[in-house]
A protein has these predicted regions:
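Residue-level recognition of single "structural anchor" positions
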Residues: 1-165
Length: 165
C-alpha cells in the first residue's frame, strides 16, 4: 500500500495566536492560494519561505515577507520558529494521542481537532469551550462507525466471512 504524501499548511498570528490548517493536494500555487484567500484577510503580510507556490499573492492583495531557507547556515527552526513549533506540537500530538496511526483519509479531521484545541488553549471558560464543541457537532451530519473507520463491511461481517465469529 502506498501512501501519498500530504502537505499541511498553517497560518499563525504574531505570538502564535490562532492557527488554521488544511490538507492540500500539493504545494503549488493552485493549492496554496485558495487556502490563503480563505484564511487570511487581504492586506495582511505573509511571512513565507522562498517557495514559488506563494508567488502571485501580491496581485491578490497580500504583502509578502520572504525568508529564504535554502543555503542558510541557520536552522529553519531558528528562522521561522513559530511555524516549526506548531509543526512539532502537531507531530507530538499525533504520535502521543494516536500512536502515529493516522490514516490519510482522516487527516483533515485530526487537523480540525488539533486546530480547535490549539486555538482554545488559553480559554478561561471551559463551559464556553464545551458549548462551542457542541455547536460544531450539532452543525455536522452524523457518520456511522463503519464510515468513520473507512470500512465497507462491519468487523462482525468480516469475522463471519473468515470463520472467526
Amino acid at each position: 500500500m502506498r501512501i501519498k504524501p500530504v502537505n499541511i499548511v498553517n497560518r499563525y498570528s504574531p505570538g502564535i495566536g490562532r492557527i488554521r490548517m488544511r490538507v492540500i493536494e500539493d504545494a503549488s500555487a493552485a493549492s496554496l492560494h485558495p487556502f490563503v484567500q480563505d484564511c487570511v484577510e487581504p492586506g495582511s503580510t505573509l511571512h513565507t519561505d522562498g517557495w514559488q507556490g506563494y508567488s502571485g499573492l501580491d496581485k491578490k492583495g497580500y504583502q509578502r515577507e520572504i525568508t529564504v531557507l535554502r543555503g542558510r547556515r541557520k536552522e529553519a527552526s531558528t528562522l521561522m520558529p513559530r511555524v516549526h513549533r506548531i509543526a512539532g506540537l502537531l507531530k507530538r500530538w499525533l504520535l502521543g494521542t494516536h500512536q502515529g496511526a493516522v490514516a490519510p483519509q482522516h487527516l483533515s479531521y485530526y487537523l480540525d481537532e488539533f486546530t480547535f484545541r490549539f486555538n482554545r488553549r488559553k480559554s478561561k471558560s471551559r463551559g464556553k469551550l464545551f458549548f462551542r464543541l457542541m455547536q460544531q457537532s450539532v452543525g455536522t451530519s452524523p457518520k456511522t462507525y463503519v464510515t468513520l473507520i473507512g470500512r465497507t463491511k462491519s468487523a462482525k461481517q468480516t469475522a463471519q466471512q473468515v470463520g472467526v465469529w
